[in-house]
Regions:
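Positively charged n-region of N-terminal signal peptides that target proteins for export
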Residues: 1-4
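Bacterial N-terminal signal peptides
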Residues: 7-14
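Zinc-dependent deaminase
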Residues: 10, 20-51, 118, 125-196
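Short beta-strand scaffold segments in enzyme catalytic cores
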Residues: 59-65
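Short, glycine-anchored, charge-dense loop/turn motifs used at functional sites
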Residues: 65-71
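Short beta->alpha transition motifs characteristic of CBS
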Residues: 71-79
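A short, polar/charged loop-to-alpha-helix boundary motif
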Residues: 79-91
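Immediate flanking context of iron-sulfur cluster ligation sites
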Residues: 105-116
Length: 196
């Protein structure tokens, strides 16, 4: 009997076509959340080239309310606005705060969707903004390997966000996101980082 149960578990684990096979989270995986995030993030990734043609960096973020309404969608603007903290996540937070007329987004139960794992700076901005949920695509390690960007030191951030009531889902639609990052690099776009 144990052998049958073990075989069934192995078959289920190895051959599952689950939408969240590679997805990670700081809560029990919710397939409905992953499905919604997959659609939104795939759309953001498709918009990436439109933004990079206008001088933006290869990262796009959007903030939605808990009813699924888009609040803002923006891109990284470090190079075209000459400001090192204008990452997509930070720009999205600033735009949402301005649109909603507040520095505290917590009462709005907002969700941030972004084409790559937030860097060290953006994690602080997200935490202090009051965003309730974060969904990202390409993990930092892949971003660094593909582009050479420095994503910073981020120990145990999933746990730290959970302690603060912030839900995180990652590694959503990574293949398309990685492809867009490769396109950015292969087209000779600016890799911006401090000269140390």
């Amino acid at each position: 009997m144990k052998k049958i149960i073990l075989m069934a578990f192995i078959a289920l684990f190895c051959f599952s076509n689950s939408v969240n096979a590679k997805v990670i989270s700081n809560e029990k995986i919710d397939n409905a959340k992953v499905e919604t995030a997959s659609k939104i993030i795939a759309d953001l990734q498709k918009d990436m080239q439109n933004f990079t043609k206008k001088g933006s960096g290869p990262f796009v973020a959007a903030i939605y309310d808990d009813k699924g309404n888009l609040i803002v969608k923006v891109a990284n603007s470090v190079v075209n606005e000459q400001c090192s903290n204008n990452h997509a996540e930070m720009n999205a937070i600033k735009a949402a705060e301005k649109k909603l007329g507040t520095f505290d987004l917590a009462p709005y139960n907002l969700k941030l969707y972004v084409t790559a794992e937030p860097c060290m700076m953006c994690l602080g901005g997200i935490m202090w903004s009051g965003i309730k949920e974060v969904y990202y695509s390409v993990p930092s390690k892949s971003v660094e390997e593909i582009t050479g960007f420095d994503e910073g030191f981020k120990p145990h951030w999933f746990k730290e966000f959970k302690k603060r009531g912030i839900i995180v889902y990652g590694n959503i639609e990574t293949e398309l996101g990685e492809q867009e990052l490769h396109n950015y690099v292969n087209n000779g776009k600016k890799i911006y980082k401090p000269s140390r």
